[in-house]
Amino acid sequence: MTQTRLSTTDYGLIGRPLAHSQSKAFFTRLFAEEGSGESYDNFELQELTPQAMYGLVLLNPQLKGFNVTAPYKVAVMDYLDSIDPAAERVGAVNTVKIERDATGRVTALRGFNTDVEGFRESVRPMAERLAPGASALILGTGGASKAVAEALSQLGVKSLRVSHSGKGDLTYDDITADVLAACPLVVNATPLGTYPDTASCPPFPFGLLGPGMMCHDLVYNPAETEFMRRAAAQGAEVKNGLEMLHRQALASLAIWRTKS
């Protein structure tokens, strides 16, 4: 969405690309059910620059806050006046609250991370069925993986991160039957499999999965990802990221609606 005139939208989403995102549809439906008259729009920014951030706020004088998705969850932190401790620990922000004075002038941009809460509550039923001492494997080492690790930590579950490059605790080649016996919960925190690239998938050794294993994908579009399909074919329990999306969205809205 390229703006050239003033908007009256209340909330929004910045990132690139945004064609796959269901956030606008979720909030539009919610506001219609509430009868609040509020609105939510996508702002697809090709680059996150000072000019882009300034334009976002200037051309949207009614904007109370916005969500942040890939690839800007880390970069946006450079433009904020304060960052919530949980977001600091994760090293990524997915929610920005805009504070204004009585004249509408922006007084502060404050960053939060509601991905942690969203994933924590989505994965809780799986985490609660883990045997004492069992850990989780997190596929990926980006900002999403850090939110997943923080959420699991809050549930008392240790985790290991997996990457191609060796930036994580393990590489994909390190995953063995013994590793999965110790880590029966696997989380795909990569964007692989997201629409329109639905055939893509992490190079995970699916043949080592079986009944009793649990696989949670953060991707929600499509509803069944290639990661989920392959895991389910081996008898593993699977779940997509739609509940996480809804929970983090509601947590973001609560932040925006809370008076400073």
Where are these regions (language model features)?
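Short glycine-rich anion-binding loops that position phosphate/pyrophosphate groups of nucleotides
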Residues: 68-75, 144, 191-194, 221
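Phosphate/diphosphate ligand-binding glycine-rich loop within oxidoreductases
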Residues: 2-128
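Active-site capping/gating segments
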Residues: 121-125, 234-260
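Rossmann-like adenosine-cofactor binding region
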Residues: 168-239
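Glycine-rich adenosine-cofactor-binding loop
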Residues: 15, 113-116, 123-127, 132-153, ...
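NAD(P)-binding Rossmann-fold cofactor-contacting core
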Residues: 154-172
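A short helix->loop->beta-strand "cap" motif at the edges of active sites that frequently abuts
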Residues: 99, 104-105, 157, 210-213, ...
